Amino acid sequence: MNKLSAVLVCLTLGFFSCNNAVKNSKKLDLAKSFFTALDHSNSNEATELISDKFKTIDDGFEQEYNGFEFAEWVKWDSVFQPSYQILKLEEEKGIVTATISKTDKRITFLHQDPIITEEFIQFEGNKIRSIERNSVSFNVERFVTSRDELVNWIEEHHPEINGFLNDQTKNGGMNYLRAIDLYRNKDN
């Protein structure tokens, strides 16, 4: 009877360990799929992976989205031709931690280098509920100085596209990109 009990205990532990590994693997797969969707600027796939009330926290700044709003943000992001690279991805206690490198035309202009963030991804069932990002490599002074120079120059020379900075729609992104191009070619 002792041997039978020991075998049953081992089988039970093995079952629950495998079941936990499968759940953890699903969360890692969801996170990978999410960053792949962002990398491909696939707003439909990205919104399928988030909960109805999705929240991002970027260095303390909170933003809540519904599916439509997040799809619009992905379309805005797509204008700059982003590249999301997963540098590290792991799961512990139900939270996925990712180190992400992002670059695009906007970041290249404002920051010159990729922005690297550590991201803490929380889930609600099989959906991503929130992502908290903390900058690992981000030169705030360079970014803000470049952004302010761009905004001030556009206000003076092309006021028709002023407001591009806060318009996170595809049209707003196109105006942002146009502002960058106009600024870069200002001496021509």
Language-model features: where?
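Bacterial Sec-dependent N-terminal signal peptides
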Residues: 1-26
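Solenoid-repeat scaffolds in large eukaryotic assemblies
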Residues: 43-47
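Short beta-edge strand/loop motif at the mouth of beta-sheet-based domains
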Residues: 62-74
